[in-house]
A protein has these predicted regions:
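Class I SAM-dependent methyltransferase SAM/SAH-binding core
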Residues: 75-130
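Conserved class I S-adenosyl-L-methionine
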Residues: 8-70, 83-84, 170-200
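Core SAM-dependent methyltransferase catalytic element
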Residues: 227-229, 248-268
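A short glycine-rich, Lys/Arg-flanked "PGG" loop and its adjoining helix->strand segment in the class I
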Residues: 154-169
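A short acidic, Gly/Pro-enriched loop at the edge of an enzyme's catalytic core
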Residues: 131-140
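A short SAM/SAH-binding and catalytic strip from SAM-dependent methyltransferases
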Residues: 139-154
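Short alpha-helix
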Residues: 210-235
């Protein structure tokens, strides 16, 4: 996978997304907007982040959050083009399942896994909704740069908890909320957005539109707790070795503050 595509995912930081417009939280409208993005130019505009990368400058090889997944049943939320499912398949997971809001993304996943000699059960649905995924079934549920698209964080975490066996593990990554507030300007880091502002906004990028909300870190932590998870590990640090390969404003920013966060939680 192209490293540049990994890096593009984190471009959604303060001062780097163009002109954001505040919008009302209308679930159907947000789903339609974001589904259209991923059915058309999502990969071209935003890029793809997939295992072994959790985001820019963070990798599973360094973090070792999954451990041995051989014989394990795995579900990916927001499976994108299938690279993370392929990674788990190569590590001998016994069952691969993937969910995505975009049928176009799922078709890419089918084609990609077929070329890799793998298969997965794929479901097209928003992550917030009931979609026939079995309960108390999976050893791992994971999401690489997808959870932040949900319109109902606590509801999504409750659904994910229902899919997991007791003591099952949920791992996800997303843009760090501080990254969304700070921009690198003239060799300085400048706050451009209020950290506490969780309102929804739309951004136009290359004739396409996306709609998001930038949630506080505490919002994720509290939603996990309410859904019956206990957090085992949270990672904010970037990998120095990966950062050394780049010399631009984004990598300089990543040396000063977190751009990605990862949480590993266990179902009680």
């Amino acid at each position: 996978m192209d490293n540049n595509s990994v890096n593009r995912t984190n471009i959604m930081g303060a001062g780097e997304v163009g002109c954001a417009i505040s919008v009302d939280m209308d679930r159907d409208s947000i789903h339609n907007t974001n589904k259209t993005l991923w059915d058309t130019k999502g990969n071209e505009i935003i890029g793809t982040t997939a295992l072994p990368f959790y985001g820019s400058f963070v990798s599973e090889e360094k973090c070792q959050l999954f451990g041995d997944v051989s014989g394990k049943k795995m579900l990916e939320i927001g499976c994108g083009s299938g690279q993370s499912l392929q990674y788990q398949g190569e590590h001998k997971a016994s069952e691969l399942w993937g969910m995505d809001i975009s049928e176009n993304q799922l078709e890419k996943t089918r084609e990609y896994l077929t070329t890799c000699g793998l298969s997965a059960k794929l479901i097209c649905s928003p992550m917030e909704e009931e979609c026939g995924i079995p309960e108390d079934y999976f050893d791992f549920v994971y999401s690489i740069y997808a959870i932040g698209w949900t319109t109902d964080l606590e509801g999504t975490f409750c659904r994910i908890a229902s899919y997991l066996k007791k003591d099952g593990v949920f791992i996800f990554s997303w843009s760090h909320p501080i990254h969304k507030c700070v921009v690198a300007e003239n060799d300085m880091l400048v706050f451009k957005k209020c950290y506490f502002d969780e309102s929804w906004y739309s951004v136009s990028l290359d004739e396409s539109t996306l709609t998001l909300s930038d949630r506080k870190l505490s919002t994720y932590v509290n939603a996990l707790s309410k859904a019956g998870f206990v957090i085992e590990q949270m990672i904010e640090e970037s990998d120095d070795e990966i950062m050394q390969s780049r010399d631009d404003n984004f990598s300089k920013k990543a040396k000063m503050l977190p751009v990605t966060f990862i949480i590993k939680a266990r179902k009680l």
